[in-house]
Amino acid sequence: MNIVGQQVKRVDAYGKVTGEAKYTADLEPRDILHGKVVHSTIANGLVKSFDLTEAYQVPGVVKIVTCFDVPDCQFPTAGHPWSVEKKHQDICDRKILNQRVRLYGDDIAAVIAEDEVAAARAARLIKVEYEEYTPIVTVEAAMAEDATPLHPDLRKDNVIVHSHMTMGDSDFTYEDGLKKAGSCYGPEEIISLEKEYDTPRISHCHIELPVSWAYVDTNGKITVVSSTQIPHIVRRCTAQALGVPIGRVRIIKPYIGGGFGNKQDVLYEPLNAFLTMSVGGRPVRLEISREETISGTRTRHAIKGKCKGLVTKDGRILARKLDAYANNGAYASHGHAICANCGNVFKDLYRDELGTEVDCFTVYTSSPTAGAMRAYGIPQAAWFAECLTDDLADAIGMDPCEFRLKNCMEDGFVDPANGITFHSYGLKKCIEEGRRHIRWDEKWSSYRNQTGPVRKGVGMAIFCYKTGVHPISLETASARMILNQDGSMQLCMGATEIGQGADTVFTQMASQTTGIAFDKVY
């Protein structure tokens, strides 16, 4: 049976086009309680006390919990497998609710009520006394010598991680490249450029807001139904946050209305679990607003890239350097991995004859936490690399296509980070085909002679995408297939269907491997 590669109907198609597909909010039971998060109104400081008197007078309020009530357990939120090597484990830097405020809108308390309106009214009536500190908004302020650490129990400064990478000699520096080039070429034969480029924060803007509901069954097992990309990791982190065995926690992931990496983080599931435990196991629903999602969940990293490039007048890149400074916000999330991934990809695009030097700094600030977002640091790397490439080509007056063809990676390149050889690159052919298809040479020549405030132009860029965590962590994958009594098969795996067609593709793979019909795999 050869079904892989064949056109089949998606296994989730009917439910999605008819509206029968059930998302998290569609599955909640009747008479469910509603939670509302109380957020800090300062960006940096300490919660001293709460006055809950007026809030408890709102009809329908069942319980109010604060940062003084939650377990004293710090946990990570990144959607990574738990590394066996301690230095590569995700950073445990937050609690279910935080007394130490690190951003405007930090989670400090929560209201449980009979309906959403009562919960929201009570949340607005809670009075909070703070000890306020000066916010640390920029990377420059966070890295200043006199900057106060936002996580003094974990770091003596605000640098989450500094990743140093080179290509060429292991101790290569850009300054070494300058010296070596100076001894091989005359000053009129080489050009050294220094440029600075920035990328902004971006919100994921998925249609379905972060939503979950939770309950405790008669055996004391905590179940959280959540719109998440990482149910198994949410299970581990929720147990860690509550201080209970993992076996007591169950996570159910229904259909997901978009995530794009924001839901590859543990968001409000631990709080939701704590809320249901606080009311004797009654089901509690917790959905945050669009405003809360943008300010309080995750964003793409804003990264400042300070770049240097050394090139010969005939168009050969000799050396490049990237100093990347990532504004990670208040909590670590995926940050320690994303900026490093950005640096890794920067050095993989071009073959610098003398070498490449990369330093990546991921920094805590008093701002929304940055985490996973589509392509995981690679858009920033491509922006830095391609802006620098265009500027180098412009500095020597060379066509950008020609410049890239002369310097881009080719078949046989060995990535020094993991030893993987590039056996099928095809990049040069891609550039040449694109060049021919859009009539690049003709347009490049004619557009260069324009004047005036409004002009036409053509541009091009390349990038590479790498995936996986080797050699930092083990690459593992597994699935379980259960043969049912009627000859059909139940397929169980950790991969999450989030619109990309994973359930359909894995069903095809299971069908072809076992010989069981495609429509008999569930």
Describe each model-derived feature in a short phrase.
Residues 1-161:
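Flexible, low-hydrophobicity surface segments
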Residues 6, 12-15, 86-87, 158-212, ...:
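Glycine-rich loop/linker segments at domain edges
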Residues 19, 63-67, 103, 193-197, ...:
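General beta-strand structural signal in soluble alpha/beta enzymes
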Residues 31-34, 58-62, 98, 105-108, ...:
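Short coil/turn connectors at secondary-structure junctions
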Residues 37-71, 109-130, 212-280, 337-348, ...:
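Alpha-helical support elements that line or immediately flank enzyme active sites
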Residues 65-106, 141-154, 233, 250-272, ...:
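Short, surface-exposed loop/turn segments at secondary-structure boundaries that line and modulate
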Residues 134-140, 398-407, 441-455, 518-522:
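Flexible, glycine/charged-enriched surface loops at secondary-structure junctions
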Residues 148-242, 408-488:
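Helix-loop-helix junctions that connect adjacent transmembrane helices in secondary transporters/permeases
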